[in-house]
């Protein structure tokens, strides 16, 4: 049974329901601790379990050990192996190839968004992430809707 959260946004106090899969797990691949903490707190507010890796080369091996994985949020600029290289390896892993993978990057430009799309990412979120929009972006992604937004 899905959980429902009803956040209030902005001065107009617009409310909308955010329905999320129960016990969802998101793997965040982010080398910057402050960025990870922000993302983890926003996911925690939504009741989403969060795992963390700091580099692209660790992703496939680690993700394959998780009993459940609903989404990967991955920075593009990572040490040792960037998000594009990690994406190729994830897509080659049988168990992981259908997991949605969203690029999350401070290099938010149309050029980067187009490159991410052409490389096979399922979505794009530009940094800084907007805490007011993030819950709805995650809900949409987890419900199978592609999200391609600069910030």
How would you name each of these model-derived features?
Residues 1-27, 31, 132-151:
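Non-catalytic signal-transmission and effector/linker regions of two-component phosphorelay proteins
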Residues 32-36:
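Short acidic/polar segment at the start of the alpha1 helix of CheY-like receiver
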Residues 37-45:
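Charged docking surfaces used in two-component/phosphorelay signaling
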Residues 52-71:
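Acidic, metal-coordinating helix/loop segments flanking the phosphotransfer/catalytic sites
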Residues 75, 105:
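Active-site residues of response regulator receiver
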Residues 79, 97, 109:
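The feature encodes the CheY-like receiver
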Residues 127:
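A Lys-centered signature of the CheY-like receiver
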